Regions:
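Serine-esterase "nucleophile elbow" of acetyl-processing enzymes
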Residues: 1-9, 20-27
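Short acidic loop-to-helix transition motifs that present clustered carboxylates
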Residues: 10-15
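Alpha-helical cap/lid subdomain in secreted, periplasmic
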Residues: 16-153
């Protein structure tokens, strides 16, 4: 079982709710967890709740790989510096959480930068933020090799 905690297709959700972590922890025999909550989480939420969210999942599944993702960069960041700054802050918080966990000795955690997640044109997005079908296809093509590489099977 592959379990992803997605933000992008459930706009406004994925705010590191502990109930979601508990639900993820209850899954029997997962192959991998993908933490893809950054698009809707705020940097302060990642800093305040990220480790606790991780611990709930990790305590239930100590050997299952966990993949941390960044928020993708959108084409409009070329002219919207405020939006780019906000994403930079969220991605930095996600990276800091990952590095903290690594320093604590956590194994089987992985971090993926979003540089080439869905391409660099505006064709992957509707209204500059939600994935189109093409964006979802690019996302799937981008993440699949990593899933195959890191899954526990």
């Amino acid at each position: 079982i592959l379990l992803m905690y997605l933000a992008g297709q459930n706009s406004g959700n994925a705010l590191l709710d502990m109930e979601i972590a508990e639900l993820m922890a209850s899954v029997e025999d997962p192959a991998i967890f993908v933490f893809d909550y950054v698009p809707n989480a705020y940097d302060y939420l990642i800093r305040e709740k990220g480790e606790q969210f991780f611990r709930i999942v990790r305590d239930a599944h100590p050997d299952v790989p966990i993949l941390f993702l960044e928020d993708p960069y959108f084409a409009h960041y070329e002219w919207d510096s405020h939006a780019k700054t906000e994403v930079d802050k969220k991605n930095a918080a996600q990276r800091e959480l990952f590095e903290k966990l690594k320093k604590q000795g956590e194994k089987r955690i992985y971090f993926l930068k979003s540089d080439d997640m869905v391409g660099h044109d505006a064709e992957a997005f509707v209204e500059n933020i939600h994935f189109t079908d093409l964006g979802m296809m690019r996302y799937a093509d981008w993440i699949t090799p990593y899933l195959k590489k890191y899954m526990k099977r």
